[in-house]
């Protein structure tokens, strides 16, 4: 058994962890002792991290926002204090950026995009898809880095919700330990002359789940012809996030934050509905690890049907309204 340090660059303001954040805690619990390092304030950490499985929560002096180098200072000190053999974070850009810089400081390895992590003897082994999801491989720390912590990012939806619920016991009081780090933006990255924060704009909050953590994703491509209305209606019925291919985002039909694929985000939902997307390898690499894929396309030779669990050859503007109607009938 090893000590696992879970890194949260921030915590929800309402004190309720996201499903992906709970998955990280459950994954850490499966490895051994669980500790946490977060850029959130001690007050926010005490509110959100009330699980009996967490032995210690490390924070800085007040909130530290990404991409501040003070976050990396905090992580480095937390690793030393906890003696962690593995550091886990979510497979998102802010976390990957911080862990990449930490890997340089500690001269150790970073494995991104993992879908499972476990111990094998004294080693921590990570399972991850490679080559656009065509193969699954396992990786661990090289012998040359022995004695140093392995840094890992895990994709959301990699752990079943029932396993997460069984692994965590809410209602405990977290032990908060403040660590000395460089003083926020003034003493962190800005002091190093690497990053200057010019402006912060809070994004409008959506009623939909976050794309990277959603258990259901409805995605559209060139075939939507600029009209995401039917997809949004289906997403509302399924409680899904909206995704898109690069063709759709480049056309300006939807924000680039919705892009799924090699140059966008990677998702691993329980259900992925692909509508009007041909399924080029660049797009497939971002969704191929979905548990169930439903493809809708007018072209029966579209590559997406090669990986789909269920395929519908037809016009999405005819198929999706029928899906919505049937879902409503079954609900009602």
Task: Name what the model sees in each region.
Residues 1-332:
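N-terminal glycine-rich FAD/FM-binding segment characteristic of electron-transfer flavoproteins
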């Amino acid at each position: 058994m090893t000590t696992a340090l879970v890194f949260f660059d921030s915590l929800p303001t309402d004190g309720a962890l996201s499903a992906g954040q709970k998955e990280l805690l459950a994954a850490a619990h499966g490895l051994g002792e669980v500790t946490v390092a977060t850029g959130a304030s001690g007050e926010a950490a005490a509110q959100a991290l009330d699980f009996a499985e967490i032995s210690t929560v490390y924070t800085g002096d007040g909130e530290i926002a990404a991409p501040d180098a003070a976050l990396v200072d905090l992580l480095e000190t937390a690793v030393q204090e906890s003696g962690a053999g593995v550091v886990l974070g979510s497979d998102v850009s802010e976390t990957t950026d911080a862990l990449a810089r930490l890997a340089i400081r500690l001269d150790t390895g970073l494995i991104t995009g993992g879908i499972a992590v476990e111990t094998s003897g004294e080693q921590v082994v990570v399972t991850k898809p490679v080559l656009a999801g065509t193969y699954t491989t396992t990786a661990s720390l090289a012998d040359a880095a022995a004695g140093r912590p392995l840094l890992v990012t895990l994709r959301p939806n990699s752990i079943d919700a029932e396993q997460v619920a069984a692994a965590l016991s809410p209602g405990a009081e977290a032990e908060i330990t403040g660590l000395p780090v460089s003083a926020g933006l003034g003493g962190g990255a800005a002091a190093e002359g690497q990053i200057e924060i010019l402006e912060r704009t809070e994004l409008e909050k959506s009623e939909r789940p976050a794309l990277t953590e959603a258990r259901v994703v409805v995605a559209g491509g060139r075939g939507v012809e600029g009209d995401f209305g039917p997809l949004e209606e289906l997403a509302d019925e399924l409680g899904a996030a909206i995704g898109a291919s690069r063709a759709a985002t480049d056309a300006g039909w939807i924000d680039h934050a919705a892009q799924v694929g090699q140059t966008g985000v990677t998702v691993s939902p329980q259900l992925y509905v692909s509508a009007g997307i041909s399924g080029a390898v660049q797009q497939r690499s971002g969704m191929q690890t979905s548990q169930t894929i439903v493809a809708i396309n007018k072209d029966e030779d579209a590559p997406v049907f090669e990986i789909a669990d269920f395929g519908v050859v037809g016009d999405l503007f005819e198929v999706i309204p029928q899906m919505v109607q049937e879902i409503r009938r079954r609900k009602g």
